[in-house]
Amino acid sequence: MNITFEGQTVLITGAAHGFGRAMALAFVARGAHVVALDVNAEGLAETTRLCGPACEAGVVDVANRDAVQATVAAIAARRETIDILVNNAGGVRGQKGRPIEDISASDWQDIFDVNLSGSFFMAQAVAPVMKRQGRGRIVNISSGAGRTISLTGIQAYASAKAGQIGLTRQLAHELGPFGITVNCVAPGFVRSNPTTEKQWDAMGAAGQTALIGQIALRRLGTPDDIAHAVMFFASDFAGWITGEVLGVDGGK
């Protein structure tokens, strides 16, 4: 299978490290022009350095609808197309699992803002561009937490990630008549950023061994494993697939 994105424009949120950086590198290697988006300017600078001139950076908070609209409008004005959107921005916003009675309204909302609202705002902004083209690919990055439960016990994270799956299915039916596919990748636990490194360390040796023992392939995934799944959904090989959720977790 030879996957290429020659001449295509790809927007990737959460591209300052981890999955997003791996995706940026993978798309650039296959001929795409990548617009790497994140709130972390320093991390974006490293992503663009690694990717080279085919990658540009844009600092934006995906939870800010007005900022998202302005950013996408500017990209659309200077690029001929926006072919692919990967909604990768997310995470737990520094939170840890706590009893439900200890969760504030802002704790709950903060996680929904970046994980679910951010995906909605980005899709909302690119949809008119893709409709005019008559073609597009949207790939949402959910989590195994959205399919089962969160390993961290963070209620908002599991709920927001499940919401991304629902959003994927709904948008697939809404946008399908315009030649736009919408699919979802649900990664298992991957040591991909400072937050997941802290979670890994907190498990201790026994917890780490137990986690790997629950995985059929008996290893943790890598950011490249997730990027490769995104490559498939974004490619012509997935042209008749939409509204689907692909678990990339080594077999759970």
Q: Where do the language-model regions lie?
A:
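A glycine/serine/threonine-rich, flexible loop-to-helix segment
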Residues: P177, C184, F189-I215
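Residue(s) in the substrate-gating loop at a strand-loop-helix junction
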Residues: S143
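C-terminal substrate-recognition "lid" of short-chain dehydrogenase/reductases
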Residues: F120-A123, R135, R219-V248
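Substrate-binding pocket helix/loop in short-chain dehydrogenase/reductase
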Residues: K96-I100, S104-F112, L211
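Short, small/polar-rich loop/turn modules that mediate ligand/substrate recognition or access, typified
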Residues: G176, T181, I241-G243
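Active-site helix of classical SDR
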Residues: A123, A160, T168
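Alpha-helical segment proximal to the catalytic Tyr-Lys
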Residues: P128, R147, H173-E174, G239
